[in-house]
């Protein structure tokens, strides 16, 4: 299985408001950058979208180390999702899971891959995290002019 590093970030100007996401894939010395934006979204939706789009860009099953600065995304996958699925996409408090559509899309995007999740503190000087933050901001700038 090919080893791939995936770095993701999402952000919003206003929450909700215009938002963007960025992803950086690195494999075998090659880097690929992805970005996108939406006019009316939330920070968490953009964080999820970055991970989904990064994984969807992989054309074959890979061993992925996915690094995010989003505790929401990392904890959702590593701690909460199993129970959400068992409880028909309800939280422990019996409320519907927010962003269910994107959590389900992320769950599907993960299936072909062997993914290890890593968390990094945002805006802490981590080079790749700073780059995907720049990509998310570029995407927002391009969307809003």
From Swiss-Prot:
Matches recorded under PANTHER family: RIBONUCLEASE H1
Localization in the cell: Cytoplasm
Cofactor(s), names only, from the UniProt record: Mg(2+)
Entries under SUPFAM superfamilies matching the protein: Ribonuclease H-like
Binding-site positions, Mg(2+) 1: 9, 47, 69
Domain of life: Bacteria
Main localization, broad class: cytoplasm
Binding site for Mg(2+) 2: 9, 133
Database matches in Pfam families: RNase_H (PF00075)
GO biological process: DNA replication, removal of RNA primer
Gene Ontology MF terms: magnesium ion binding; nucleic acid binding; RNA-DNA hybrid ribonuclease activity
Gene Ontology terms: cellular component: cytoplasm
Catalytic activity: Endonucleolytic cleavage to 5'-phosphomonoester
Self-association and partners: Monomer.
Domain RNase H type-1 residue range list: 1-141
EC number: 3.1.26.4
Function: Endonuclease that specifically degrades the RNA of RNA-DNA hybrids.
Cofactor, free-text remark: Binds 1 Mg(2+) ion per subunit. May bind a second metal ion at a regulatory site, or after substrate binding.
Protein name (record): Ribonuclease H
Sequence similarity: Belongs to the RNase H family.
Keywords assigned: Cytoplasm, Endonuclease, Hydrolase, Magnesium, Metal-binding, Nuclease
Biological classification of the source: Bacteria, Pseudomonadati, Pseudomonadota, Gammaproteobacteria, Thiotrichales
Gene: rnhA
